UniProtKB/Swiss-Prot annotation:
Family matches, as Gene3D superfamilies: Sigma factor-binding protein Crl monomer (3.30.310.230)
Domain of life: Bacteria
Protein name as it appears in the record: Sigma factor-binding protein Crl
InterPro entries: Tscrpt_reg_Crl (IPR009986), Tscrpt_reg_Crl_sf (IPR038208)
Role, per record: Binds to the sigma-S subunit of RNA polymerase, activating expression of sigma-S-regulated genes. Stimulates RNA polymerase holoenzyme formation and may bind to several other sigma factors, such as sigma-70 and sigma-32.
Amino acid sequence: MTLPSGHPKSRLIKKFTALGPYIREGQCEDNRFFFDCLAVCVNVKPAPEKREFWGWWMELEAQEKSFTYRYQFGLFDKEGNWTAVPIKETEVVERLEYTLREFHGKLRDLLISMGLALEPSDDFNDEPVKLSA
């Protein structure tokens, strides 16, 4: 499948995978890509498959000459689902912001190298993290 930008989807998936353990290929559809980061374990006592994590997820959509994004912070529960919830612990918020900024920078640099821009979605109003200089 070729995206509106003219780049084959399979090539983009390969490049996105090289950015790190962020892309969830099974949740990517058509011209949309899904990334997430399980940044902070809520409680290490349960078995690994039963643990919950604080983290973020990002949806990326291919446009003609750019990709648009929206992201959320929240809880990745033991069933493997994301829920947007407020996070009260300062250290956790700082870790999430750091990992999101790091990923955003890598993603932006990759897209620029391909002649594409990275911009917030028109319907993405909430920007709690300063992602670009």
